């Protein structure tokens, strides 16, 4: 039995999210196990079909739906669809295979312990019925048996599984599903680790690209191939390589909220913020239709439904659409938990609870910030720290140094809480890292307020370095790029050339965002480069065309 580093070293995002919202109706299968009740057949699941999966039309429809839902990162609902396929055709070996596959690990989550026994039972049934399956499903069942050599969730041999799938992709060179499943397994082995910091591909990335490219050539509308291609290239130096797949996903599976959302990952990297916002609005609507049909809770709701609101905020903020952005932050928490109470000890729920504070800071709503109720003491150290940060920023930006200093002292005390080092936001970055940026930013605001502009620049340079050192997440967990503040501080210091470099750096991170375009215009103008400044002003006007707030500085 092989217990790989894949299983041992990471307890990734979705397992941490599944228990974040509590309540009596959450009793039952935890994490990503099958949802309760009979599986519905949803509208809008696209045209993906698997003719050799099952003998009955109903089972084939459930099977195809399960595959699409799994590729749309809703494994609990996918498992329920495979159970529907089994109910319609109990002797369907492929349907049992699908259930075992859906309960396994993904690029976002290791296998949940509670899913191990159901997966083992489904795989056992698939193996018992394999003689009735098509040749390729017999091969897939045998490959999945390599992945799950024992019943434990930590007994995953992903490397052995990938080796079998690589061989099957070669054996079936005209089979898009085989290529996607092989690529998926290799992605699982190296989650989000496909590009080096300098933009060069990792040693395994070329094979992932080749497998997915083959699948897309064979089946341009394959939901899994398009989804994984976007994830692969959103982190690359050339995110535009996934623009065709992003466009396809806008309409490919209108019933999958997550697949509708996926184009936004490329839109944000390529400066198409209006399209990113629209993609998330469509995904929110699709998930609302889905949630009206099923009582989905746990990982999908917390990890993906709320994520759409978070992403909408990020896109709308880059457009200057304050009303849409602020409303999106206020909707994230309810989207995560619905009517269930949330556990503020969960880093992801504290993250969603903090979003409205960040939004009010981003848009300079100082008086609204000062009326925000202090969070209760207890297990929400991150939320409390960011409340102090937001209030301190409001005091500093309204010219109240004594109050701002008191808030900074409270923030520094809150930052010393040991809990912050172990509280992970979306199981990616420690809350302490973000609180550190908050301390540096508030120190800079206070220094600028009392005329110590050079000191303010120094604090903000440290904040930029701290932000750059964070692990990647999209949207970025620090919700107002620190380069906006640094560039503004450099302009205040008369250091226009340095400000220009900072704003150009930010525009490489967030192309055509109005905040940095405005800052760049000011920096060029102060250097006497009026022709260039006018060209950038035209770009700013295009970027800010849908804004509902005026902008005279690169930050409020």
Residue ranges with predicted function:
Residues 62, 96, 103, 139, ...:
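TPR repeat positional signature
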Residues 69, 103, 146, 186, ...:
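Residue at a conserved register position within TPR or TPR-like alpha-solenoid repeats
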Residues 87, 169-171, 218, 248-255, ...:
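Solenoid-like repeat scaffolds
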Residues 100, 104, 115-128, 268, ...:
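TPR/TPR-like (Sel1-like) alpha-helical repeat modules
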